[in-house]
Amino acid sequence: MEIADKIISYLKETYQPDAIIVYGSFSDGSANKNSDFDALVIASHSKEHDSSVIDGTILDVFIYPVDTFLSEYDPEEFVQVWDGTIILDKNRIAEHLQKRVLEYIERTPQKTDDEILQELDWCEKMVSRTLREDTEGYYRWHWVLFDSLEIYCDIKHLHYYGPKKALRQM
């Protein structure tokens, strides 16, 4: 049995879920020995985070009560599942969640040219502050490096889905 199958079995036994959406590297086929296992579990269970280790793989699994998706919720909170793999979906909750997230992404306005220019000005200002070569300068270097991926996506008029996907788009 492969590790993903063992993890899915663990999730089913532990949470008796209505739905499971796997996202990230185990969903897109880029998992390696250092990958964690990202998933959203919808179950008659309290909201929690499961960071158990199964056969050396760390879980990054978010469990949400079914009620979360039966009332109004912010789809931005769940944007990571937009292209995830639905493993289990007893009542089409996962299907509706993905659809709602995709609609949210499509409705998200792109940044204007002025907003992008402001972001680029901010980058230049931050890079100039890194020249101090002190603790604050090193912090600002990290900050601009982190934010530059999202700014790159803004420039290219792409939705930012996180660092791994942004790096692949480059």
Q: Which sequence ranges carry the predicted segments?
A:
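Conserved NTP/Mg2+-binding pocket subregion across the NTase superfamily
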Residues: 50-135
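Metal-dependent nucleotidyltransferase catalytic core
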Residues: 1-34, 40-87
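Conserved nucleotidyltransferase catalytic core and NTase-mimicking acidic/glycine-rich helix/loop elements
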Residues: 111-170
